[in-house]
Amino acid sequence: MDVGELLEDVLRIYSPSHGEADLAKYLLEYLKRFVPDVWIDEAGNVIAVKGSGGPVVWLHAHMDTVPGPLPVKREGGVVWGRGAVDDKGPLVAYLKAFLDSNPRGTLVLALVTAEEDDSAGTEALLRGGPPRPDYVFVGEPTNLHIAYAYRGGAKVYIELESRGGHASSPIYDNIVEELFAVYQEVKRALGHAERYDAFTVTPTIIQCGEAPNKVPTKCVMVLDVRIPPGKSCRDLAQALPPKARAGPCTEPVEVSPTNPAARALTRALLKLGVEPKLSRKWGTADFNLLVSLTKNIAAFGPGDPALAHSEDERIDIAQVELAAKALKLAVEELGIIPRRL
């Protein structure tokens, strides 16, 4: 398969969260050319299986991207487009590794929906579907680092209302000012700091005002809050001031950096002449959910995470190919390791 060509093709299919159907159909037809056991499940996930028996290894990546299409272009060995880094570059690497691998057990490719939103695709996999995994590799842009920890996360909402009034009159309370006061209160309550081991609070959406000469009657601010190790969703909820509320929350997770999946990747990279590097991720991903299936898990993939969700998403095709080679070696090594029951 031509990795660069496939990457360009999937980038041209815009697939924001809950809008992955066209991409899923494309990937289904593509995979059918190589493996017979492939389908789209009730959550819109594309699932492919090869081999049989144990151990069972999952290659997991997500089809969706953040909103906002970008033009797709290729210059030399670099491809630009929405999702080039997060997560279509890793997805293509995982797809290639799946097709190239000769597993001694069962190999599952799970290309899921809505990771950037409510993780509906992975939630469906947790309820059932393909054979349960002994080992999981999660496709995320790690720049070929092996990630073993992710922070938790939740959206926090500040929603204020007032009677409004004429902008020329100072007698009215202005909820714009109150909105920012509550935001600062949230930061103080959580001990916001730009460190991995601290809560981080980032405003992402502000909706406020109806006219330039009118005191607003409603203001909404959405905060992206990340939860550090050692803290929990409960800690977040208990710390929030009365005028802020948390939405659905994901707990932080950490597994052993020497678990079999991580070790298999370490050895694979060494065989390829790449220095293995471990990392803890500042974000939140389906990794946080998949640890409920197995602690033998690692996140890994091509792409610079600093470019994820940006207007300059781009990825080096050679790194996608290198990631696929490392995954293939790791999958085949795990096939000769006795399962941990």
Swiss-Prot record:
Reactions that this protein is recorded to catalyse: [amino-group carrier protein]-C-terminal-gamma-(L-lysyl)-L-glutamate + H2O = [amino-group carrier protein]-C-terminal-L-glutamate + L-lysine; [amino-group carrier protein]-C-terminal-gamma-(L-ornithyl)-L-glutamate + H2O = [amino-group carrier protein]-C-terminal-L-glutamate + L-ornithine
MF (Gene Ontology): cobalt ion binding; hydrolase activity, acting on carbon-nitrogen (but not peptide) bonds, in linear amides; zinc ion binding
Cofactor: Zn(2+); Co(2+)
Lineage per the UniProt record: Archaea, Thermoproteota, Thermoprotei, Thermoproteales, Thermoproteaceae
Top-level enzyme category: hydrolase
CDD domains given in the database record: M20_ArgE_LysK
UniProt key word Metal-binding: yes
Binding site for Zn(2+) 1: 62, 86, 140
Cell location: Cytoplasm
Known role: Catalyzes the release of L-lysine from [LysW]-gamma-L-lysine and the release of L-ornithine from [LysW]-L-ornithine.
Annotated positions binding Zn(2+) 2: 86, 116, 309
Entry's cofactor comment: Binds 2 Zn(2+) or Co(2+) ions per subunit.
Active-site residues, Swiss-Prot/TrEMBL: 64, 115 (proton acceptor)
This protein's record includes keyword Amino-acid biosynthesis: yes
Cellular component annotations (GO), alphabetically ordered: cytoplasm
Keywords: Amino-acid biosynthesis, Arginine biosynthesis, Cobalt, Cytoplasm, Hydrolase, Lysine biosynthesis, Metal-binding, Zinc
Protein name, entry field: Putative [LysW]-lysine/[LysW]-ornithine hydrolase
EC number: 3.5.1.130, 3.5.1.132
Pathway assigned to this chain's UniProt record: Amino-acid biosynthesis; L-lysine biosynthesis via AAA pathway; L-lysine from L-alpha-aminoadipate (Thermus route): step 5/5; Amino-acid biosynthesis; L-arginine biosynthesis
Main location: cytoplasm
Source taxon at top rank: Archaea
Any single biological process term in GO: arginine biosynthetic process via ornithine
Provenance organism: Pyrobaculum aerophilum (strain ATCC 51768 / DSM 7523 / JCM 9630 / CIP 104966 / NBRC 100827 / IM2)
